[in-house]
Amino acid sequence: MSKFYDVIKPKASRPPVWFLRQVGRYMPQYRELKGSQTLKDFFHNTEAITEATLLGPSLLKVDAAILFADILSLLDGFNISYDFAPGPQISFSPKEELIFTNDPQDTFSYLLKAIKNLVKRLSVPLIAFAASPFTMACYLLEGGASKDFPKTMAFLYQHPERFDALLKQLAEATVIYLKEQIQAGASAIQLFESSSLRLPSALFSRYVTRPNTQLITQLKNSVSSPISLFCRCFDENFIDLYSTGADTLHPDYHVNLSQIYTAVTHPGSLQGNIDPALFLLPQDQFLNHLEKYLSVLKHQPKYIFNSGHGILPETPLENVQAAVLCLTSISTS
């Protein structure tokens, strides 16, 4: 049984380690693999997905691989047009009726074939992933990435019932999408609520906690694989996420994990959440920060080391490798 799975169920002898966006532009090998392919073509190429996913374990020696895909892949199931130019560009109107595919195995065949290939080649667990409902709704309503989500917030305030209905539809589709990934061979699930920091605290429970609770409940009725929830938020809202039913909670770098372990009687399995900007430092300085960060967390029995957001494109590969080496040398016994 792998370290990643162990930390969610039994104890591990050291903190398992993997990273958000652990494969990406910071890797010369990834840039060579992608070559001149467009991002959309790359994300729909079974062989490319397979080889890119394998770069994480092979180059970093991490304890888990996360499927190399994009959160917008879910939109294939709605037949919504999107592209990367270079950022996400989505053609969607809130007036459109969302109808999800009745043949997900065919719609996502490029992805499911990659998962089946990977399971044969990996010696670590493969993590399936998808966006949580609020984050996917933000992409749809903004037509792509956004800093302040003005269209989303305006729609949310003007049409709260319609926004609730949109979140419900997205959650139901995400259950189908992730269930197919698990049935193809993935052994764990990572949910990404990466747009949630924009919400006022008073709206967090309605638009983040409740939809994720519904999503996780439906997932647990369909699959037995462990579920981790990544969420961008502050400490006060993070505590609210304990009611979602996620097996592991993964805050971004705004949350002080050490304080969570102190404040919560039964903190359960936590994952994260070192600031990815620290990886940009000269290696000796970075490792000093890492040792301080781990001084308390490494002793927590259900702790998984990870980044508090995706690894940045400017990151030296050697620093990520050094972080893994530091983690794998830890003994908590």
UniProtKB/Swiss-Prot annotation:
GO terms for molecular function: uroporphyrinogen decarboxylase activity. Keywords: Cytoplasm, Decarboxylase, Lyase, Porphyrin biosynthesis. Substrate binds at R21, Q22, V23, G24, R25, D70, Y139, S194, H309. GO terms for biological process: protoporphyrinogen IX biosynthetic process. PROSITE patterns: UROD_1 (PS00906), UROD_2 (PS00907). It comes from the Bacteria. One of its GO terms (cellular component) is cytosol. Its EC number is 4.1.1.37. It catalyses: uroporphyrinogen III + 4 H(+) = coproporphyrinogen III + 4 CO2. It is an enzyme of class 4 (lyase). Its main location: cytoplasm. The record marks D70 as: Transition state stabilizer. Pathway: Porphyrin-containing compound metabolism; protoporphyrin-IX biosynthesis; coproporphyrinogen-III from 5-aminolevulinate: step 4/4. It is found in: Cytoplasm. PANTHER family: METHYLTETRAHYDROFOLATE:HOMOCYSTEINE METHYLTRANSFERASE RELATED, UROPORPHYRINOGEN DECARBOXYLASE. Catalyzes the decarboxylation of four acetate groups of uroporphyrinogen-III to yield coproporphyrinogen-III. HAMAP family: URO_D (MF_00218). Belongs to the uroporphyrinogen decarboxylase family. Homodimer. This is Uroporphyrinogen decarboxylase. It comes from Chlamydia abortus (strain DSM 27085 / S26/3) (Chlamydophila abortus). The gene is hemE.
